[in-house]
């Protein structure tokens, strides 16, 4: 049984029973996704216009509209397909895993591959992957509220269950979807997929959240307002043209086409694509985003609460010091005292302490392979191995009876083993938790009373080790149920990551407060914080000190502190709320099952990918696959970048749409001929709205992105003069297009040549404007134009389509264009270039006024 299934048997059962998954919602097929592009309201209007054209015999217009609709549908399909593929990759990466024994070897596999009969291992923080009967259990308890609605922890035991009346209340069964709160166990899978209790009573899908983000909803609302205004403008254009004597059909088509060209119907979709691309970019940098809305929120983060171990530090623990009552030892390749190698047999307390390292652990290490388990426990295991101890020999000689796994609340771990015909208990944990339990001390070869002077010496040793930035653990043992006998201390080095130091400096420049949270000793935390460059005159607070403050007092003084030591998960929750009371947007890291409430309460919950439990990962908005603070800071930078990029392409789309509306409306009101024909407006929409806007959403962060304070979440989207710039630029585009049209007529051009001149001016001015939108703080002439090859490619493709429409005889017939003479191309060039020059002049005037203030 303890060998588990063979790989072949597991494959056979997987074929027979299917994957360990609940029924999924049907995925969008490519054909259905493509046809879905035609359900858009704007497309419906275009198709209606096509029918009108056919009925009136305008076949050229009808075919042109259909071709453009098809092209738009293809572009929309490609964008949606790429977005769906990105989100599918995200779903696969967040799929749970399980520790399973196959062919006698423990391995980690996708939970979907589990089958009946598999032997699985469960530990605190795991999400149970399938219904399973406990084979062994050590202090295990589960949260089954997802099935029963009862939030109280349910203790579980291995062995046969006598009461079988209620399938959901069996003490020897753990159920798929429930969370292990404490303890550890091995269990045999008895049901998978839809045959589990979860599968029978629920069709809930554990899927990536893809609902609309707040920004998407705001922009969708904006789109509706703009659409309403455009419809009013279209009605005005229609009646003004008819009143002037233009053909009703022509004006009807013109009005409809203005609506199609001017209404930013693709705005929410473009935001979704930009967010999905940002998520994909973050994944490549080890930041896995669970929820799209967190991408926006990350950009507003003003406080990063980071765990010390593994996030700020390397999480590569190395035991450097061992202290017993009579001696202090250093550890490198062996155990040394004053530089000379020593044998543990010479020091009974040291030998017993190393036995505790070998037995009071859940870590495993096979020589020649990487150790498996918590970094702290593996460090202790390796230290004992350096002294000649073997984990396997110790387990065989002293069989395990019972284990109380490490708990973040109690900060200690305890095991009971058979020891020379009797029972012995080993204890390890935080010094301030272990020392008060002990009444005796192993001093040399004798057990003596742990006097107050001895206690003071131990506390002094803890202080000394902590001031060297070492993580300190204490060890004790007792025979049967006797008194606890203190053994000694270990000091472990876990230095700050170089990348974390740089990340903290970046946060300081970005006006983001970085706070270190740890369960370690206050002195250790302060030493690490000093090395990492975190303090800057701020102080440290312990969990005990935090408990003496009310919520109001904590919020009032919290800005004075950069380090919180000896804290538990409940303290984390209070810290999140205290920072939120100050108005800050809080990102909180966590890895344990008890961290889930704080992760959910934080504006951005961040779980650890390596050391994090499944419960923490599912509660989090973001998962750091490398447990690295610099990855979180990169995610914050990307959050700022994506918001800036969304502002950029909204600025681009709206100013272009305003330019098109101004061109058509002013032309009609000024008594000019219709400036652009419906097919020409559709061409404008095709070449300027799609690819350039998407490419603008792929801009890299601006150099000063992390030298600005975080954005306030309640800040209006059009703050900072964005709306004024959009309207002004739209007016410039419209006026210059009208000017080009008028100049072409004055130079003796035909109406078709004037319209072609206006068409080229309108499109080229918009393609130039896309480069202006790369920055809100620099004019076009001070921007790096070549650092986004996708934008360059999009503009090149759009310009190529325009020139083809002007030069190609077949396209000339479709879009009613004519080749332009050199004077008219000069008009196009001057009109298109005048717009960014005017914008740059206005930008300089505005910047000068701001400087004077």
Where are these regions (language model features)?
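Conserved cytosolic headpiece of P-type ATPases
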Residues: 1-707, 717-718, 731, 745-746, ...
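Membrane-water interface at loop-to-transmembrane-helix junctions
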Residues: 712-731, 751-757
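Long hydrophobic segments that form regular secondary structure
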Residues: 741-750
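A C-terminal functional module that forms or caps the active site or interfaces directly
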Residues: 773
């Amino acid at each position: 049984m303890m060998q588990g299934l063979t790989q072949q048997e597991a494959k056979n059962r997987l074929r027979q029973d299917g994957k360990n998954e609940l029924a999924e919602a049907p995925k969008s097929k490519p054909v259905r996704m493509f046809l879905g592009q035609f359900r858009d309201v704007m497309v419906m209007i275009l198709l209606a216009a096509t029918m009108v054209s056919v009925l009136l015999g305008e076949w050229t217009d009808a075919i042109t509209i259909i071709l453009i609709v098809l092209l738009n549908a293809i572009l929309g399909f490609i964008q949606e397909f790429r977005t769906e593929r990105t989100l599918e990759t995200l779903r696969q990466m967040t799929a749970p895993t399980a520790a399973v024994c196959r062919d006698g070897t423990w391995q980690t596999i996708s939970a979907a591959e589990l089958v009946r009969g598999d032997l699985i291992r469960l530990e605190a923080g795991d999400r149970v992957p399938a219904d399973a009967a406990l084979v062994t259990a050590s202090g295990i308890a589960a949260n089954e509220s997802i099935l029963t609605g009862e939030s109280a922890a349910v203790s579980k035991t291995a062995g046969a269950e006598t009461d079988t009346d209620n399938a959901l209340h069996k003490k020897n069964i753990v159920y798929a979807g429930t969370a292990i709160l404490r303890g550890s166990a091995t269990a045999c899978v008895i049901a998978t997929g839809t045959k589990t209790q979860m599968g029978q009573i629920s069709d809930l899908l554990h899927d990536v959240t893809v609902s609309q983000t707040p920004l998407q909803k705001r922009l969708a609302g904006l789109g509706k307002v703009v659409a309403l205004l455009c419809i009013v403008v279209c009605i005005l254009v229609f009646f003004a043209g008819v009143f002037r004597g233009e053909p009703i059909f022509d004006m009807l088509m013109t009005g409809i086409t203005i609506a199609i060209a001017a209404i930013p119907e693709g705005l929410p979709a473009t935001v979704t694509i930009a967010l999905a691309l940002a998520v994909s970019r973050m994944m490549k940098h080890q930041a896995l985003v669970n929820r799209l809305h967190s991408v926006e929120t990350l950009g507003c983060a003003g406080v990063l609460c980071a765990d010390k171990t593994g996030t700020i530090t390397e999480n590569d623990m190395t035991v450097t010091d061992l202290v017993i009552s009579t001696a202090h030892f250093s550890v490198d390749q062996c155990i040394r005292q004053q530089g000379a190698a020593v044998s543990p047999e010479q020091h009974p307390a040291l030998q017993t302490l190393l036995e505790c390292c070998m037995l009071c652990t859940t870590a495993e290490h096979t020589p020649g392979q990487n150790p498996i388990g918590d970094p702290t426990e593996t460090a202790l295991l390796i230290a004992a191995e350096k002294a000649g101890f073997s984990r396997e020999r110790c387990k065989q000689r002293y069989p395990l009876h019972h284990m109380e796994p490490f708990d973040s609340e109690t900060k200690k771990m305890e095991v009971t083993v058979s020891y020379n015909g009797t029972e012995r208990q080993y204890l390890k944990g935080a010094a301030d938790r272990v020392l008060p339990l002990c009444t005796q001390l192993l001093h040399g070869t004798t057990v003596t009373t742990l006097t107050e002077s001895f206690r003071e010496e131990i506390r002094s040793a803890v202080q000394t080790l902590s001031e060297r930035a070492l993580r300190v653990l204490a060890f004790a043992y007792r025979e049967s149920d006797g008194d606890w006998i203190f053994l000694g201390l270990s000091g472990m080095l876990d230095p700050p990551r170089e990348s974390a130091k740089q990340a903290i400096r970046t946060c300081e420049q970005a006006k983001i407060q970085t706070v270190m949270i740890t369960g370690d000793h206050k002195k250790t935390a302060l030493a690490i914080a000093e090395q990492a460059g975190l303090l800057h005159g701020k102080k440290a607070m312990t969990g005990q000190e935090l408990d003496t403050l009310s919520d109001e007092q904590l919020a009032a003084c919290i800005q004075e502190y950069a380090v919180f030591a000896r804290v538990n998960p409940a303290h984390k929750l209070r810290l999140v709320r205290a920072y939120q009371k100050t108005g800050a947007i809080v990102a909180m890291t966590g890895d344990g099952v008890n961290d889930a409430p704080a992760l959910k309460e934080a504006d951005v919950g961040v779980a650890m990918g390596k050391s994090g439990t499944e419960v923490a990962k599912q509660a989090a908005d973001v998962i750091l696959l490398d447990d690295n603070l610099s990855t979180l800071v990169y995610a914050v930078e990307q959050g700022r970048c994506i918001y800036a990029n969304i502002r950029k392409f909204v600025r681009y789309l709206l100013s272009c749409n305003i330019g098109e509306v101004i061109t058509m409306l002013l032309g009609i009101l000024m008594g000019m001929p219709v400036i652009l024909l419906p097919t020409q407006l559709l061409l404008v929409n095709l070449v300027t709205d799609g690819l350039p806007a998407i490419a603008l959403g792929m801009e890299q962060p601006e150099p000063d992105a992390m030298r600005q304070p975080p954005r306030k979440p309640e800040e209006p989207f059009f703050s900072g003069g964005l709306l004024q710039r959009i309207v002004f630029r739209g007016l410039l585009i419209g006026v210059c297009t009208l000017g080009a049209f008028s100049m072409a007529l004055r130079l003796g051009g035909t109406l078709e040549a004037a319209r072609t001149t206006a068409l080229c001016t309108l499109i080229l001015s918009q393609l130039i404007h896309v480069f202006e939108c790369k920055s809100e703080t620099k004019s076009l002439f001070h921007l790096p134009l070549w650092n986004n090859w996708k934008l360059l490619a999009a503009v090149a493709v759009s310009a190529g389509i325009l020139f083809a429409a002007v030069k190609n005889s077949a396209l000339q017939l479709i879009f009613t264009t004519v080749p332009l003479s050199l004077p008219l191309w000069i008009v196009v060039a001057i009109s298109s270039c005048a717009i960014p020059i005017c914008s740059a002049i206005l930008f300089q005037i505005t910047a000068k006024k701001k400087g004077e203030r």
